[in-house]
């Protein structure tokens, strides 16, 4: 009964998702209209439609951009959830097609949805496109253009810099960041950086140099913020998808299967052996405590009753473990799909993150690089790494409810660390040796 109530409440919550999302988008559109009516004579929020100062205009533009972002997000949720519900409820719609009351309610709901969507479109049509997405795209294009052609921003007059950068971003549809690993030449990179720094400091055009420093700082700050945000999204979204799908969808389905097949208790032989060993240990503990006087001496009937009660608890515990293990398999699959979708739809952000990580890793001192390489190799491919890999494999098997396979574990430990060590050595020889030869020399000395 409790399971049915939970499934019904969850189903009702999913069914009302499109309505909730549309209402939130509608309220955000009302907020934008309220700002336009009160402060901009019912027109678009811009400098041309009001006599406020720059700070006030910026404040209202930020508010509108925030509401536009909410509207776009809620409309995306509305479309996706409505499509999913329309596919899942197709049969119910066909069965109730002839009911006049149901048909009338559907028509009324459709009219309400149409009116709200029409109002939302009228509000956001004034702003042509999402201001926040446009700002992000422009910033990414500026970073990419300046990384590819530094002379675009360095040599142009201050009044024409933004125009040239923007034109460069329009001409190039794909953004290719020049990572630190690609900046190689005849002279060492540190030597060239020092010369460039001295040249900039003695440049008589000090005003232009200061502007370049500010531009570089803004670009670096934006790149750092975008990279951290994207990395957090890569972590949070799969975890959130995992918990939501497992809690509200997978576990109820698997529990329903186990309730129909009560004879299924253990999903593999290892779990059964663990349960029997635990039950046997409990029975022996009762005998032992009675013999040494730590507990009352129990009769065989009483011991059997206690063991029977413990067997019921163990059965419930291992059934729950089996349910969680099966749910983990599909929840991890959904998480992986969400992770891949985020990567596929974030190509620009990936370019920014790659450039950000390259600057951090290749900007470390030579001893720091050597220390991190030695730490990584000793941890994953060193002498003591087989014990760590064995613990990881046992944890993965327990997570998915798989029986432990010693032969597979030994085969994995004998091959995967070797492959990892080969890839690392190739990276040191192919890339690090060209970019930072002193770091490679330091690594060899520390490793010896």
Curated annotation (Swiss-Prot):
InterPro entries: CemA
NADP keyword on record: no
Membrane-crossing residue ranges in chain numbering: 231-251, 323-343, 372-392, 408-428
Membrane topology: Multi-pass membrane protein
One Pfam family of this chain: CemA
Keywords: Cell inner membrane, Cell membrane, Hydrogen ion transport, Ion transport, Membrane, Transmembrane, Transmembrane helix, Transport
One MF term in the entry's GO annotations: proton transmembrane transporter activity
GO CC terms, sorted: plasma membrane
Compartments in which it is found: Cell inner membrane
Function field: Required for H(+) efflux immediately after light irradiation to form a rapid H(+) concentration gradient across the thylakoid membranes. Together with PxcL, contributes to transient H(+) uptake following dark to light transition.
Family: Belongs to the CemA family.
Protein name in the entry: Proton extrusion protein PxcA
Gene assigned in the entry: pxcA
């Amino acid at each position: 009964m409790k399971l049915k109530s939970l499934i019904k409440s969850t189903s009702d919550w999913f069914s009302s998702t499109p309505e909730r999302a549309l209402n939130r988008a509608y309220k955000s559109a009302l907020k934008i209209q309220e700002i336009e009516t009160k402060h901009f004579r019912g027109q678009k929020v811009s400098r041309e439609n009001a006599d406020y100062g720059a700070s006030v205009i910026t404040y209202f533009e930020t508010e509108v951009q925030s509401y536009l972002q909410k509207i776009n997000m809620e409309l995306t949720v509305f479309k996706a959830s409505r499509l999913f519900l329309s596919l899942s409820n197709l049969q119910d719609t066909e069965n109730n097609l002839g009911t006049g009351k149901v048909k009338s309610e559907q028509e009324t709901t459709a009219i309400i949805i149409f009116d709200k969507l029409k109002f939302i479109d009228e509000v956001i049509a004034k702003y042509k496109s999402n201001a926040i997405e446009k700002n992000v795209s422009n910033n990414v294009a500026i970073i990419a253009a300046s990384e590819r052609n530094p002379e675009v921003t360095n040599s142009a007059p201050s009044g024409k810099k933004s125009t040239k950068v923007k034109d460069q971003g329009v001409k190039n549809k794909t953004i290719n960041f020049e990572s630190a690993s690609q900046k190689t030449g005849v002279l060492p990179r540190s030597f060239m950086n020092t010369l460039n720094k001295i040249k900039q400091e003695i440049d008589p055009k000090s005003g232009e140099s200061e502007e370049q420093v500010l531009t570089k700082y803004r670009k670096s700050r934006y790149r750092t913020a975008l990279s951290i945000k994207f990395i957090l999204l890569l972590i949070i979204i799969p975890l959130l998808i995992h918990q939501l799908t497992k809690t509200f969808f997978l576990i109820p389905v698997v529990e329903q299967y186990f309730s129909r097949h009560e004879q299924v208790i253990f999903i593999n032989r290892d779990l059964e052996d663990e349960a029997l060993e635990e039950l046997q240990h409990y029975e022996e503990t009762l005998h032992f405590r009675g013999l040494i006087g730590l507990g009352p001496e129990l009769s065989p009937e009483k011991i059997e009753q206690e063991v029977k009660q413990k067997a019921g608890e163990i059965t419930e515990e291992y059934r729950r473990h089996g349910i969680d293990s099966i749910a983990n398999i599909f929840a991890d699959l959904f998480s992986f799909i969400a992770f891949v979708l985020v990567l596929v739809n974030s190509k620009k952000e990936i370019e920014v993150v790659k450039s950000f990580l390259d600057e951090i890793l290749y900007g470390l001192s030579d001893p720091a690089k050597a220390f991190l390489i030695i730490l990584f190799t000793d941890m994953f491919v060193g002498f003591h790494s087989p014990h760590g890999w064995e613990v990881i494999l046992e944890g993965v098997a327990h997570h998915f409810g798989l029986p432990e396979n010693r032969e597979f574990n030994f085969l994995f430990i004998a091959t995967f660390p070797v492959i990892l060590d080969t890839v690392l050595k190739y990276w040191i020889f192919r890339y690090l040796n060209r970019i930072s030869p002193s770091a490679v020399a330091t690594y060899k000395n520390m490793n010896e």
